[in-house]
Amino acid sequence: MIKIKNFIIFIIIFSVLNCSKEDKKIKINSILLFGDSLMSGYGLIEEEHLSKILEKDLKLDGYSINVSNESISGDTTFDGLNRIENIFLDKNYDLVIIGLGANDMLRGINPNVTKKNLEKIIEIILKKNMKILLTGMVASPTRGLEYKKKFDQIFPDLKNTYDLNFMPFLLKGVALRPKYNQSDLIHPNLLGIKLISNNLKEIIIDLM
């Protein structure tokens, strides 16, 4: 009798967990990239832009998803905040991938300011019932350990506060590796873009 009860309890728990996973799955037909030069295609021809590569990669895996790009080179989180409302005047997307913060770090902007700007951007997107994939960035140690600690913590904090889908580091496997970067060692080359695309693709597919 005890064994039967335990079995029933196990089935109930398994069913609840399985349902919760299914509830988090989302239907994705359209994606927006919203970032800076790391997403905009800086130094690359149009066919090598992240939006183009990601769309092709998803299609090769059997997913027909339109990937749009509203990333602008040089944008800080403040710049992104100032223009985001106009992007959604007549368009909505199933998933918005946020890739902002690198230029804030390069300019030494107070991490508290960066975080507040990102909070406002996130809230605008969520109010329009669009899902978010937040990509993280890390600060260079040359900014100082205190700055780096505060900046690096921005992204996991936002992930937890808003329960967001999260990619801890946009440039995972790419940063500071000559093979994957242009001569400035900052902006990804085609190989770098392909690696970023593959990393994003795996997360996106897991969401569906």
Question: What is each PLM-predicted segment?
Answer:
Residues 2, 21, 206-207:
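Extracellular glycan-modifying ectodomains
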Residues 16-18:
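C-terminal motif of bacterial Sec signal peptides marking the signal peptidase cleavage site
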Residues 10-14, 132:
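Alpha-helical transmembrane segments
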Residues 81-208:
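Alpha-helical cap/lid subdomain in secreted, periplasmic
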Residues 38-41, 45, 71-75, 103-106, ...:
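Short histidine/acidic/glycine/proline-rich micro-motifs that form metal-
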Residues 20-73, 79, 83-92:
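Serine-esterase "nucleophile elbow" of acetyl-processing enzymes
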Residues 14, 60-62, 127, 161:
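Short, well-ordered coil/turn elements that cap or connect secondary structure elements
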Residues 3-10:
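Sec-dependent signal peptide recognition
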